[in-house]
Amino acid sequence: MFRGATLVNLDSKGRLSVPTRYREQLLENAAGQMVCTIDIHHPCLLLYPLPEWEIIEQKLSRLLSMNPVERRVQRLLLGHASECQMDGAGRLLIAPVLRQHAGLTKEVMLVGQFNKFELWDETTWHQQVKEDIDAEQLATGDLSERLQDLSL
């Protein structure tokens, strides 16, 4: 399980260094193999360990290619999916087209989200957090039943 937000730097080749606390888990569970794709709702990337991505692929394969909305989701997620292998130094190379999609330059937020990471431009991440907090404060009466049952 991945949690927390960590500031990491992209080097001049577009590689990011995976925080040490995640490396062993990624090596054990995925042999360091990851898949990166775009998020279709936000200007960030989604970074999955390969076994988790394979579950997503199975779900995507069940969508109907004749349904235009489902086909569009398949095209966006699979069409942008890029395999990346963690090297001996614990770095992952993020494809240029993906970096461009999310506006990633030097400072990147690596955000743990249970079975995957999100990769955000640092400035965009902070703006999104502010928007999320503001929206949550406005929506106190609009909580779903699942959120109402969540006790923190």
Swiss-Prot record:
One of its GO terms (molecular function) is transcription cis-regulatory region binding. PROSITE patterns: SPOVT_ABRB. It is found in: Cytoplasm, Nucleoid. Residues 5-52, 81-124 form the SpoVT-AbrB domain. SUPFAM superfamilies: AbrB/MazE/MraZ-like. InterPro entries: MraZ, MraZ_C, MraZ_dom, MraZ_N, MraZ_sf, SpoVT-AbrB_dom, SpoVT-AbrB_sf. The keyword Cytoplasm applies. Its main location: cytoplasm. Pfam families: MraZ (PF02381). One of its GO terms (biological process) is negative regulation of DNA-templated transcription initiation. One of its GO terms (cellular component) is nucleoid. Keywords: Cytoplasm, DNA-binding, Repeat, Repressor, Transcription, Transcription regulation. Belongs to the MraZ family. NCBIfam families: division/cell wall cluster transcriptional repressor MraZ. Forms oligomers. Negatively regulates its own expression and that of the subsequent genes in the proximal part of the division and cell wall (dcw) gene cluster. Acts by binding directly to DNA. May also regulate the expression of genes outside the dcw cluster. PANTHER family: TRANSCRIPTIONAL REGULATOR MRAZ. This is Transcriptional regulator MraZ.
